[in-house]
Structure formats: structure tokens, C-alpha cells
């Protein structure tokens, strides 16, 4: 075998496809860079990408192809898009000795009883919500609102449930009154007008969202049309920098706080970002500037480090790659907080830090290419940091128990 087959089961045609396509592009460029520099242990890496259309049964079909122990199989999966999708393969991944990096930040992945072979990237929806609500509360107090009220709104399932659970934990710890808890009520593609009406009626000072960029756009524009413009914030998938080019841009500028697990495109002083930009611009000069590349790049960094460790251990089997993940620390060249998975104590190893960014519409360059360079419209406020309430939380499994 002169190649190392690495799999990605990615949403290339479903609700997150615009972002995931860019994430896969970055992984592709990363592995091309690794291969140009001699590969891993003298072998070239072949990235095998299959589309799940953000559909769980399709994801399971794709996994069946990748778990094959013959020539069609892969040694690890460097991206599995979706929380319910990855949950559906989590137990099989243990049976198959396959390491999987999820494109999902469900807090259950850190629990060895559930996500033993799921090697998560960065923090999770729950802790991101705790950090985010703590910042939002502080921000409102700085604006002169001593006891700001909160509404929570999100999707059902592992993603929505986990993000909303973290917001509830933060509200409880900080004594924030939750005037509307609409976690689990927003259905993508459905008529969400009644939910928006409930948000407007509750009239909270701040709203925490665990949505998609499409449903956040509906909610913010729908509420604004009824004269309701609170301070909005939410989990990573709620926001896309591309929204700044649409009707919502001005309201995002004044009324939305962005949370991230990674740095964004224009964050100064990050050595790994300069490497990424140079490689991406050389490989795809006409592609648009995007924060999503950083997600794909860091996924590939973690996979690369594990494969290098497996090669060093002289065990490039699937089990050898799983073992390698449990031995390494990944520093991501400053693109994200340092990460480890081994050691046997998830409360010690779970990443609690996230980043807070301000939306600056003037810094958004719509359609700017990698060759030209440009901004994605966010400026770092704080991070990587964990709120005191997040540091104090004992990790004992997923915040959301569906």
C-alpha cells in the first residue's frame, strides 16, 4: 500500500453545504501540501469524500462504504458532518476501530461511554453557550441594563438541545431570568412564524440561538419587522459571515455577537493563519475568502498529527490511529485552543475556551477572492477564554441527554 486513505462524509448538498464545501476544500489543499512535502512515512494521503446531503440514512450508507476492510475502506474519517449523523455511527466506529473527527460540537463526544472513537475538535455547543451567555450578560450590563432577561431558541436534537442546555446552565449559574425557552421548537424548512411571534411577545433583552444561518435570518428579520431588536448571539452554526452581504447585514452589525471555536480570517498575530492563507491562495486563487477554511484546515492538522504519530509507532492500522489520537496534543498553530483526548479524564481534557467576535460590517468584503484578500467582517473581542462558570462546570457527559 503506497497510499493512506482518509475519508470524509460531508454535507455537500444539504442545509450546511455552502460552508462544508469550503471546509472540504481546505482539507484537500492541506493534504496536497502534505503530499508535496513527502506525505506521511513516505506514503501519499488520498482524501476520499462522499456526500451525506445532511441526511442520516445517507450518512450510514456512506459509512458502510468507508468501514470496508478492503481496498475501498479508509484508515480514519477526518470529517463526519452533523451531530445526529455522527451519533448514528459512533458505536460502529468503536467496533471498527475507526477514528472519526466530527464536524459537530456536541458535548457528548468527550464522554468515552458514548464518543470513545469520536475525536472532537475544539470546545462544544454547551460550553460555547455558557461562555456566550456570560459575555452577553456582561455586555448588556455595560450598556446599563442591570438585570437583562434572556430568551432561548433552537433546533431539536443533539445540536439544538446541547446549545440550549448550555444557555440554561449559564442562566441558572448567573441568575438570569429566562422569559421564553423555545429550545427545540424551530424546525428547518417549516413555517417558524409562531416561534418568532413568541420571541417578540417575550421581549427579552437578549436572545441565545442554536439555529442555522437561514433560520437565524428568518428570526432576526421577522422579529425586526415587528419592532423587536434585542441583542442576539448564538452557537457557531447560527452565524455565517455570508449573511453580512444580505438584508440582515446592518442589524448583525449592531445587534449580533459572534461566537467561534477558532480564530476568524482577519485575526492578527496568528502564525498558522499566514501559512493557511498562502497555501489556499496558491491552490485556489479565485475562491472566495472564508472563515470556513480554518475549520477544514484544523481538522486536517489533527488528522495529520495522529497519522504521523501512528507512523512513528509503526502501526498504521485503524487501531493504531485510534491509539495515536490518545497520545497526541495538537496546538493548531494558534488557530484554535490546544487539544488532547487521552489521559482518561474527560473533565480534565475537554476544551472549555471559545472566542467572542464583534460584527463589523465595514470590514466585510463581499466576494473577495483568496488572491485579492479581504475581510469576513468580524473583529476579536475576547478569546480564547472560558467564563468562570464554564471553568467550574464538572464535565460528566453530554449537557443534553436526548
Predicted regions mapped to residue ranges:
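Short, well-structured alpha-helical segments in soluble
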Residues: 53-75, 138-142, 190-203
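Signal peptide-proximal N-terminal region
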Residues: 4-6, 25-47, 69, 141-143, ...
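Extracellular/periplasmic ligand-binding modules, especially the Venus flytrap/periplasmic-binding
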Residues: 164-166, 213, 218, 265-328
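Short beta->alpha junction loops
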Residues: 48-57, 123, 180-191
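Extracytoplasmic "Venus flytrap"
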Residues: 1-27, 50-57, 81-84, 154-162, ...
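Extracellular/periplasmic periplasmic-binding protein-like sensory domains
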Residues: 223-297
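Solvent-exposed, acidic/polar segments of extracytosolic/periplasmic ligand-binding ectodomains
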Residues: 4, 330-402
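Extracytoplasmic ligand/sensor domains, especially the bilobed periplasmic-binding protein
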Residues: 71-183, 231-256
